[in-house]
Amino acid sequence: MDKNIANAMLMRLNKQDQVAALQSIGFTTVNENTPASDIAKYMQWAGTLLDLSLATLRIEDGEQVFFTASEWNSMSANNRSKYIRIGIRLRAECHQFIIAKSDCVDAGGNKTFKWGGYGTDLRGLKNYGSGNQGLYDTFDGKENTDVIIETLAGVKDTQGTVGAPAAEAARAYKACTLESDGIEDTTVWNLPALGELMLMAKYKTEINELITSMFGNQNIFTNDWYWSSTEYDASSSWGVDFNYGGVNTLGRQYAYRVRPLAAINTLSL
């Protein structure tokens, strides 16, 4: 057999294996026609941080549009005025989502929120004990937030907290409003699941650099504890320490920071 033909067949077989592997971990749009340069990007995305981009809403139609820092910085002021910046898109380790541009703050200026529901084991939320298989692979923040808000709406727990302050704050978050920005934020914001929150903590340095560049350092992740929407038991849920990256259970009667997240359900470049 001609050596060039043999090499071409080998390269094709290798690409077929790569495509099959990428498809098996969620990159379902990858196929044999995907350029080799994109295959390399998907392989990076599968194992580490692919990139961080500025997430915006286009004022004209409300569509989400993403820009690299260099793309945004090279735009004219007139072109920038057509978009509202809402957060940072993270693409890493087989996942992508939008991180809100700032932590939640209530009407009184408070920056921490109780989880709520102390004493209630929420039906519809899986209890993840310490070392529980799958704990670090929880990326269901939207589903969790839906359940938490619906279950605890108007319910006063044994510690006197009404509802689900942390989840409610995340869902009510607005990165922009019609009155102040010319467009209403219709993004569905959520209280992150533990796996989502851990990715944010893992790449905190890179995220904070882009946040500082795009929104100012007053909006960076602090070194405090942040709530996740992942349940431990009837009195505790999981949180992440953004100082050292530690993970632990936190009593729901205590108040910690909330950084909303918006899901992106596709995995394509």
Model regions and ranges:
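Short hydrophobic beta-strand that contains or immediately precedes a catalytic carboxylate
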Residues: 99, 191-192
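C-terminal, surface-exposed recognition/capping segments
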Residues: 2-18, 194-269
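Alpha-helical scaffolds flanking conserved acidic
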Residues: 186-190
